[in-house]
């Protein structure tokens, strides 16, 4: 009983940390990275299709992404999709290869991005605390139904608190790394 609650809480906390990492990877830093364009969909014969299924995206250098479109007719649609995204990027086409230069981030934009990143991290911490609360409520329900003793409940709550502290520390580490990456010029 108790082990199931702890295992469930741990899995959910790890998923929260992973979700935060994925969310932060989409926030643009000064460096070019193919994952910047993962959220972009292209209209492919009437169906929205992820960019990585119709083109190959690579980092050409620190400030340029190169996109090789598989189907020549899609080149303009890919360009349009990148322009329409809210990433503020200006693609330049050369045959089937589209180059996307990344403008350098201004100090003000970096600070805004750090605020956004901190907000995302706080959302992750709140999610982890909610998972802790749910697990503790499950333990209290077991105690109320006299399925576990008070000592077992207290011990389990302490272990869940340790899991929570570990997850929050992971979130803080991810946040610190992303802030450092954003503030590098």
From Swiss-Prot:
A cellular-component GO term for this protein: cytosol
Originating organism: Vibrio cholerae serotype O1 (strain ATCC 39315 / El Tor Inaba N16961)
Keyword Protein biosynthesis: yes
Entry's family note: Belongs to the RRF family.
The protein, known as: Ribosome-recycling factor
Cited function: Responsible for the release of ribosomes from messenger RNA at the termination of protein biosynthesis. May increase the efficiency of translation by recycling ribosomes from one round of translation to another.
Matching CDD domains: RRF (cd00520)
Molecular function in Gene Ontology: ribosomal large subunit binding
Domain of life: Bacteria
Keywords for this protein: Cytoplasm, Protein biosynthesis
């Amino acid at each position: 009983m108790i082990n199931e609650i702890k295992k469930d809480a741990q899995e959910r906390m790890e998923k929260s940390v992973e979700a935060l990492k994925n969310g932060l990877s989409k926030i643009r830093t000064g460096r070019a990275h193919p994952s910047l364009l993962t959220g972009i969909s292209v209209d492919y014969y009437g169906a929205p299709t992820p960019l990585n299924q119709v083109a190959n995206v690579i980092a050409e250098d620190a400030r340029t992404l190169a996109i090789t479109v598989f189907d020549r007719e899609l080149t303009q649609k890919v360009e349009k999709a990148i322009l329409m995204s809210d990433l503020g990027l200006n693609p330049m086409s050369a045959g089937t290869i589209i180059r996307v230069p990344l403008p350098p981030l201004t100090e003000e934009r970096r600070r805004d991005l750090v605020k956004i990143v901190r907000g995302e991290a706080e959302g992750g911490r709140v999610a982890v605390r909610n998972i802790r609360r749910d697990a503790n409520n499950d333990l209290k329900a077991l105690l109320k139904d006299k399925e576990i003793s008070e000592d077992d409940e207290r011990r389990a709550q302490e272990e869940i608190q340790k899991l929570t502290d570990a997850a929050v520390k992971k979130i803080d580490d991810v946040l610190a790394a992303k802030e450092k990456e954003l503030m590098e010029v």
